[in-house]
């Protein structure tokens, strides 16, 4: 608390407000908590596009959040899970990463994550039997600016686009593109799209009624409340990405206001900005 105020009093005053989900410290506490494994499982299946028997069903947290621990930064992913499969099917290993800034070092670090996670699967003196590795990255910049898609799978392929090794996959989700091109994705009813919209609604503290009947999102709505986070833990959390989210929200509201004042159709403004009609009218 740089201003010398009482952070406990701050948490008490704003206990029913929402934290910024994509903050490193906040997402770790929410998704890496044993009690929220249902949330994490649903999000992973949505991000990887897994359905039916391919779904992750009973994952285990490798580095669970422990109540009372402080947030920290390291060279490994904050959220890491494993999921056993029947028979001889290799075990799944899944990590979740969030990146707000488009820096060259991010790609280097992401490749380093993949290399380290893969290396850790091999035991000394044994023939390597690699697990099915999935690294999921939620990005707030375009990894593939020319692509019409916001979800991308990256694997080892040859020049004819044939997959050489299918147990090492990086899934990149361009969050910012999804909302910047909201009109393009307006009819996307995939589970991943639902997740992105639900998270965005909570980050903006907008009307959540659209998601209130979904049991998973109901839990999510409860877990992002500030009162779920201790003042001691919040003091260790870097909030710079929260500031960036606020800048993005302010930019979106400005676009909505200009479109409204120019006489644009309300349904179009809603699609483009993701804001509710009520919010747009009150700007």
Predicted regions and their residues:
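Active-site environment of non-heme Fe oxygenases that use a 2-His-1-carboxylate facial triad
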Residues: 157, 174-175, 220-221
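Accessory alpha/beta interaction modules
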Residues: 1-170, 179
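Ferredoxin-type iron-sulfur electron-transfer modules in oxidoreductases and energy-metabolism complexes
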Residues: 185
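Intrinsically disordered, low-complexity linker/assembly segments
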Residues: 168, 174-176, 191
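Short, charged alpha-helical interaction segments and adjacent helix-coil junctions
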Residues: 1-17, 25, 82-90, 94-99, ...
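Short amphipathic C-terminal alpha-helix that caps PH/PH-like domains
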Residues: 44, 113-114, 192-199
């Amino acid at each position: 608390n740089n201003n010398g105020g009482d952070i406990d009093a701050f948490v008490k005053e704003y206990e029913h407000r929402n934290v910024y989900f994509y903050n490193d410290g906040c997402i770790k506490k929410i998704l890496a908590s044993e009690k929220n494994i249902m949330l994490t499982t649903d999000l992973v299946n949505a991000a990887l596009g897994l359905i039916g028997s391919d779904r992750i069903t009973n994952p285990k947290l490798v580095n669970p959040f422990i109540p009372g621990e402080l947030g920290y930064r390291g060279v490994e992913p904050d959220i890491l899970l494993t999921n056993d499969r029947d028979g001889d099917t290799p075990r799944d290993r899944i990590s979740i990463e969030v990146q707000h800034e488009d820096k060259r070092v991010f790609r280097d670090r992401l490749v380093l994550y993949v290399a380290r996670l893969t290396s850790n699967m091999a035991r000394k003196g044994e023939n390597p039997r690699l697990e099915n590795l999935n690294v999921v990255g939620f990005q707030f910049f375009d990894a593939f600016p020319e692509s019409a898609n916001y979800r991308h799978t990256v694997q080892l392929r040859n020049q004819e686009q044939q997959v050489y090794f299918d147990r090492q996959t990086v899934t990149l989700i361009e969050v910012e593109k999804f909302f910047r091109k909201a009109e393009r994705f307006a009819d996307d009813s995939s589970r991943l799209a639902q997740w992105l919209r639900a998270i965005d609604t909570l980050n903006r503290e907008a009307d959540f009624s659209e998601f209130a009947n979904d049991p998973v999102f109901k839990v999510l709505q409860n877990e992002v409340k500030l009162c779920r986070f201790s003042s001691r833990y919040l003091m260790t959390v870097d909030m710079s990405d929260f500031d960036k989210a606020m800048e993005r929200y302010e930019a979106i509201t400005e676009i909505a206001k200009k479109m409204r004042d120019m006489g644009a159709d309300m349904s179009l403004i809603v699609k483009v900005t993701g804001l509710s009609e009520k919010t747009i009218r009150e700007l």
